[in-house]
Amino acid sequence: MRILFVSNYNAWDKVGKGVMPSHHLFGVNEMIDHFETPDSAILKSQFGGGKIDFVKVANPSKIELLKLYAKCFSYDVVYDVLTAVSKQFGILNKFHLFRPRLVTIFHHPPFDKMMKYAKSDCSVFFTEELMNEAQKSIQDNRQVVCNRWYPEKAWYDINKLTLESKKVYDFLDNGKTARDHNLFIRCMRLMPNNRAVIVTDKKHIPTEYKEGENVDLFFQDEPNDLTMLQLCLKTKVMVIPLEENKKMLGPIGATSYMDTIALGMPVVTNEKAAFAKEIVDNGIGCLFKLNEESLAKALVQSLEKYDKLHNAMVSFSGSHSISKYTEMLNKYLFKKNV
């Protein structure tokens, strides 16, 4: 078995160096016996043995796509974890012009064009709601599955041993994509006795931010998991203030959500978040509608119920890890019935 892992960032390098948790490899790290080179690894015998190669594909040119297309014929499976090539190769696959099995994680709707004009042999979604939305546009017998993404808790447990964990902040907002930081800042003004920190870069400073208030800015140009771990350990509650969207939200904020699960942090997020139902069903956080009154209420509730939410998240974390994702992924990659 030969697998080609395709992503738009080289997580395998950072995971190998221990500076990034392995859930950024979307289940394959647990299948690896050892790396032969920085970009190539041998699979464990229980996963059929064989080899997995890693390739970064970000905004490829036509020539780069042609070269990659030719390369793919040497593999049994192409695992596209961030939909980097499935639009192009999926069209070829639909017309039986793509030899390997194409397994794709679909993250953000709308899915209609991708489902109609391209075909992945196995389409993976992080929630049942996203999967059901995609199926509305499918008219063939392709495999469509839900496989919920969860964190590699061991990475957090090991790395937090050497870090300070005294709580300095009540709230952490550490995302950039589709976040309403200004709404969060306005709500914090209603809570002058509490403190928060927002992770951003100098090009995207929230317009509502005023120096000297109860919200600090932490500047970071490139993602750094160890830095985020330190901030998480200094904070009680994670806030994911997703922007309002009339359409279904994809798993935006999922990386921050992984941090909360691994560390037992209660979470506050938009009721339209992809993982909102899971939060409610397991009592691990508070949801809000996108207005100041609702968010402020959710922030207050998360502190009032902190111990209960924290304990529930710790319990949830114990039974929801990347190993569950790997177990299901193994079936998809090797064409086993699920």
Each predicted region: which residue ranges?
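Nucleotide-sugar-dependent
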Residues: 226, 240-258, 269-277
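N-terminal subdomain of nucleotide-sugar transferases
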Residues: 1-46, 189-192
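Conserved donor-binding/catalytic core segment of Leloir-type glycosyltransferases
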Residues: 163-181, 185-191, 197
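A charged, aromatic-enriched C-terminal amphipathic alpha-helix characteristic of glycosyltransferases
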Residues: 290-292, 304-334
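A short alpha->beta transition loop at the rim of the catalytic pocket in nucleotide-sugar-dependent
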Residues: 236, 264-266
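Donor nucleotide-sugar binding/catalytic pocket of nucleotide-sugar-dependent glycosyltransferases
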Residues: 121-158
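Nucleotide-activated donor-binding/catalytic signature segment of Leloir-type glycosyltransferases, i.e.
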Residues: 206-237
